[in-house]
Amino acid sequence: MSPQIDLVRRMVEAYNTGKTDDVAEFILHEYLNPGALEHNPELRGPEAFAAAVTWLKYAFSEEAHLEEIGYEENGPWVRAKLALYGRHVGNLVGMPATGRRFSGEQIHLIRIVDGKIRDHRDWPDYLGTYRQLGEPWPTPEGWRPCPPPPRRRHDRSTDTP
């Protein structure tokens, strides 16, 4: 394997083991996966990646793992073809745990800069996973609770005597 693919395999290993104490060795301080912004909009770098690993294990159980299907590279880019296996045990964008097992293929595009992972986009099989989970509905609070409606203030200037 190439050094770039080895870096991506370290990323996959972190997702599989949940071990994140060494991610600064292979995740650049500018790391960003736009798909993770929903969970931690302010985080970047190794901390953002570690939070994504923690979330994966929280939502899909400690046994969740990525199976390596194949890797390709083109310049600074690595394309990883993976399959995620897990069990829905935690809140998933407002949908309470179903306990159901699922699997789904994914494509990850990863850019290596200065010998570390900088950019990461992933496209999981959302539809297939959703169906395997039994097509659950979010709780009333959803994944983005609505703020309470603004309190109406009484405008005394319109009062008539």
UniProtKB/Swiss-Prot annotation:
It is an enzyme of class 5 (isomerase). Residues 137-161 are annotated as: Disordered. Disulfide bonds: none annotated. InterPro entries: Cyclase_SnoaL-like, NTF2-like_dom_sf. It catalyses: methyl aklanonate = aklaviketone. One of its GO terms (molecular function) is intramolecular lyase activity. Pathway: Antibiotic biosynthesis; daunorubicin biosynthesis; Antibiotic biosynthesis; carminomycin biosynthesis; Antibiotic biosynthesis; rhodomycin biosynthesis; Antibiotic biosynthesis; aclacinomycin biosynthesis. It comes from the Bacteria. Its EC number is 5.5.1.23. GO terms for biological process: antibiotic biosynthetic process; daunorubicin biosynthetic process; doxorubicin metabolic process. Keywords: Antibiotic biosynthesis, Isomerase. Disruption phenotype: Cells lacking this gene accumulate aklanonic acid methyl ester. Optimum pH is between 6 and 7.5. Substrate binds at Q106. Belongs to the polyketide cyclase DnrD family. Homotetramer. Involved in the biosynthesis of aklavinone which is an important precursor common to the formation of the clinically significant anthracyclines such as carminomycin, daunorubicin (daunomycin), rhodomycin, aclacinomycin T (aklavin) and aclacinomycin A (aclarubicin). These compounds are aromatic polyketide antibiotics that exhibit high cytotoxicity and are widely applied in the chemotherapy of a variety of cancers. Catalyzes the cyclization of aklanonic acid methyl ester to yield aklaviketone. PANTHER family: ESTER CYCLASE, POLYKETIDE CYCLASE SNOAL-LIKE DOMAIN. This is Aklanonic acid methyl ester cyclase DauD. It comes from Streptomyces sp. (strain C5). The gene is dauD.
